[in-house]
Amino acid sequence: MSAEPVVAVQGMTRRYGDVVAAEDVTFEVRRGEMFGLIGPDGAGKTTTLRVILGLLAPHAGTVRTCGLEPVRQGTELSRRIGYLSQRFSLYGDLTVDENISFFASIHGVKGWKPRRDELLDLLRMTPFRGRLADRLSGGMKQKLALACTLIHTPELLVLDEPTTGVDPVSRRDFWKILSHLQRDGLTLLVTTPYLDEAERCQRIALMDRGRLLTVDAPSHLKAEAGEAILEILARPKRQATERLRELPEVADVQSFGERLHATLKGIDRANPEATKAAASRLAADLAAHGIEVESVRPVLPTLEDIFIARIEAAGLDTAAAVR
């Protein structure tokens, strides 16, 4: 594995007029890893990608992609990367095969048919090679777009929110394909607002409102989260949430389906006795206020818990921070 990163971003800032879309962003993407830029809409993910791809010039800082300066060496860079944008353009009146053929010609790929067959087999699209793109489902269109993006065998695959608007089954299938590509040695840089997808990345950068909050492996971020978290199943849920937020020993309350996650103020996860005592106190308090408590138990933090904590530590508003 080469020691030189495939992507190196150092102190990058990009503005749109008076609006700072990305501020002093620094991170590296290592060869052979799947790296995720994670954050809500407006976090600066797409702007950062466009600077990395050479579609925008930074106003400050430096960026190197595949060892090249993206803006100055854009033509050479385009031969070495694949970019699946949020609005990748397929030709609806062309078949699957014809779309792939078209993109192979754009990239000047010679003898591309064996590569096409390999990709169609990987994507389980061989039976549909004669179908018009307009007649494919949303998930199948996304697979075809991926095949077109990979036809020239890039060393870096960049994907901007590739599963937005895709049904859950197709979304899961698409990420399995990306994981397969990564295991085969391809370097991937992907943006997503979905924290469950971030779990599939080797490392992630959490972004919010143009600022980089942290860069690390998801497992490391979870291990470093210090304050204990209680998972609470109580009804009515709304009243339970309101009461928990009134308690001085509760630092934060987040909703996860039917359950609540209450972060305890000043109680470390490494102190199970204190966590157990706090759980008993919270359960008793909720019951005293007429709230039915089914269960209270300590749990490991989710990436959403960590993201919220990082946003709060940075002094930012947590509203609409995650999906």
Question: Where are the regions a protein language model picked out?
Answer:
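ABC transporter nucleotide-binding domains
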Residues: E4-V7, R14-M207
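ABC-family P-loop ATPase nucleotide-binding domain
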Residues: M1-T13, A313-R323
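ABC ATPase "signature
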Residues: V215-D216
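Short amphipathic alpha-helical interaction patches enriched in hydrophobic/aromatic residues
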Residues: S85-F88, A225, I229
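Short acidic-hydrophobic catalytic motif
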Residues: S219-E224
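Short low-complexity, flexible loop/linker segments enriched in glycine and/or proline
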Residues: A205-L206, A309-E312
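Short, charged/small-residue-rich alpha-helical element at the C-terminal edge
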Residues: G226-R310, R323
